[in-house]
A protein has these predicted regions:
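Bacterial N-terminal signal peptides that target proteins for export
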Residues: 1-8
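Extended, histidine- and acidic-residue-enriched regions that form the cofactor-binding/catalytic faces
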Residues: 24-136, 140-156, 162-349
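C-terminal motif of bacterial Sec signal peptides marking the signal peptidase cleavage site
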Residues: 17-18
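Cysteine-centered motifs
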Residues: 12-14
Length: 349
């Protein structure tokens, strides 16, 4: 299995790809139908099977999108990553359509599944706001969906998500590699390659907040300044109480594993009160260029194996290794419980 190091991992970050003006409503409110001579955006669930069969296998891209449900503090909906992954997909489609008007873009409905939650770092494994599945389950879903597309001859599959948990990312990278190698297609985990370059742009944050701003606020990450800003830009679901939230300072990634021992943690880090839609717009515009560049490399057939990949780009950390071992232990216990129950049920048949 891909080497996993859980350092910055639990800073669940959302990669949204966009370059649209602030006054324009999010594209993710609905896929756009184009003329029927190519260059269409097609919702898979709305097509008949003859219509699917007419799609060009080479000049089309299937977008396989995952949006997990996870606590994001008292101010951002638990569907934060879901909404942002949806935005990634639609806004990247806009960018790609401009560059490749001959391609059909096929939109698979967002799958609301993900592994882990930032609350796990606080040892709150059953947090009321997080609905997660096991790593092996997520990997299997991604593989099966990818195979279902690739086995029909469609050559391009872009996997989009918005969650920073390491095993979540590894599941998608392994699934993409399996489908690509087994079926001779290009299934690319776009988001984890973007994360390999970094999350939110320090340059953008410094521009808006001033250099050294995080000396007071700490690293921005899960439901903090950056992520709250991104949500403010994308939709109107952020609770106005974000303006009154006190900073929860984590000085560096090593401090992530101490949050469960500190009083007052409400499911976020950094300082949500400093967020703004304007910051979110600029962070997103930075991310769109990186995501689009990776997508272009994939479409041109470039070897992506030399690109930095999350979480393989993280440094080693004993606390992370211990946490990862505990996570696999919990999953093994759950799987053993399920296996025992199924065996008992089958004995009675």
């Amino acid at each position: 299995m891909t080497s996993v190091r859980l350092t910055l991992a639990l800073v669940c970050v959302c990669t949204i790809v966009a370059c649209m003006p602030a006054e324009e409503p999010p594209v993710s409110q609905g896929a756009e139908q184009a003329p029927m001579n190519g260059g269409r955006v097609l919702k898979l669930e709305e097509l008949t099977y003859p219509e699917i069969d007419e799609i060009d296998r080479d000049q089309s891209i299937f977008f396989l999108t995952f949006g997990n449900l996870e606590e994001h503090g008292p101010h951002i909906p638990v569907g934060s990553d879901y909404y942002q992954a949806n935005g990634v997909r639609d806004l990247l489609i806009k960018r790609l359509r401009a560059a490749h008007p001959e391609y059909d873009m096929v939109v698979v409905p967002v799958i609301p599944l993900g592994e882990g939650g930032f609350n796990d770092a606080a040892h709150q494994f059953d947090h009321v706001g997080t609905f997660a599945i096991r790593y092996s389950t997520l990997q299997a879903v991604a593989i099966d969906m990818g195979v279902s597309i690739a086995s029909k001859g469609f050559q391009n599959i872009f996997l989009i998500h918005s969650h920073g948990a390491p095993l979540h990312n590894v599941a998608f990278t392994e699934a993409s590699a399996f489908v690509s190698e087994t079926y001779g297609v290009r299934m690319v985990n776009i988001t984890s390659l973007v994360f390999g370059e970094g999350f939110y742009s320090d340059a953008v944050l410094d521009k808006h907040l001033g250099e050294g701003w995080n000396q007071e606020s700490g690293i921005t990450g899960h439901a903090g300044t950056g992520e709250t800003s991104a949500n403010l830009f994308l939709h109107d679901l952020v609770n106005p109480n974000y303006r009154e939230l006190e900073p929860f300072v984590v000085e560096d990634s090593f401090g992530i594993f101490d949050i469960g021992d500190r009083n007052g943690w409400q499911g976020y880090i950094s300082d949500p009160s400093r967020a703004s839609a304007l910051i979110g717009r600029d962070l997103i515009n930075d991310l769109v260029e990186r995501s689009f560049r990776i997508a272009e490399l994939a479409l041109s057939g470039e070897d992506l194996s030399s690109l930095p990949l999350y979480p393989d780009n993280l440094p080693p950390m004993p606390e992370a290794d211990a946490y990862l071992a505990a996570t696999f232990g919990r999953y093994a216990s759950r799987e053993a419980e399920i296996t025992a129950w199924l065996e008992k049920q089958r004995e009675g048949r």
